[in-house]
Amino acid sequence: MVRTRELRRGFGDRTVLRGIDLDIARGEFVALLGRSGSGKSTLLRALAELDDAGTGSGELRVPSERAVVFQDSRLLPWARVLDNVILGLSGADAAARGRAALAEVGLAGRERAWPRELSGGEQQRVALARSLVREPELLLADEPFGALDALTRIRMHALLQDLCARHKPAVLLVTHDVDEAVLLADRVLVLQDGRLATDLRIELPRPRRHSAPEFIHARELLLAALGVDLAAPEEEKQAS
């Protein structure tokens, strides 16, 4: 599904990705952690083929059917919700597919709404609908819940898990939140200085509980891999 070997990317004289070997199977949910500047978004953009491949080298195989969700929903403000979802879709059933996707994310009846009439969480639901209506084989998500409040994040986590279980795309989620990574992912990667330093499989049943000893253990392993002092205050224990 996704395969990279010795993938390298850089900007000018600066090398950002230093030989990434990565495999993601269909239906597998992978989370990517790393400190700011470690190359997380660069790797995601490479997998989305949104970057200039001329700035790098290595093997890159990704499916042609892929979708990207960003922290900013990137909805067109002058287009209604349904029109945002089906933008670029062809076929007589495009509108019906768009309505079905909106129903999947809990926004049935909001097809005629303008983006400005939606909350931040609702806008991200539209962004998910826009991605999944295309039935992507690969879903790339770059901190999609970073700007949402805590309660909305919890709801969006549950929604994303449900949608991925139904549609079974390969998923790469870029996040700064270690708990989010352990909660959602089958595997968690840590990117450090442009290299994959950690690849941790999360062997926990779903739904996962933050209080479970196995959850806490995985969290501590990842925080240590990120170089976080486990004795530090709670607010410092994130992939800054």
From Swiss-Prot:
Quaternary organization: The complex is composed of two ATP-binding proteins (SsuB), two transmembrane proteins (SsuC) and a solute-binding protein (SsuA).
Name of the protein this chain belongs to: Aliphatic sulfonates import ATP-binding protein SsuB 2
Keywords (A to Z) from UniProt: ATP-binding, Cell membrane, Membrane, Nucleotide-binding, Translocase, Transport
GO molecular function: ATP binding; ATP hydrolysis activity
Class in the EC hierarchy, top level: translocase
E.C. no: 7.6.2.14
An annotated GO cellular component: plasma membrane
Reactions this protein catalyses: ATP + H2O + aliphatic sulfonate-[sulfonate-binding protein]Side 1 = ADP + phosphate + aliphatic sulfonateSide 2 + [sulfonate-binding protein]Side 1
Subcellular location: Cell membrane
UniProt topology in membrane: Peripheral membrane protein
Native source species: Nocardia farcinica (strain IFM 10152)
Membership in a protein family: Belongs to the ABC transporter superfamily. Aliphatic sulfonates importer (TC 3.A.1.17.2) family.
Record-linked SMART domains: AAA
Lineage of origin: Bacteria, Bacillati, Actinomycetota, Actinomycetes, Mycobacteriales
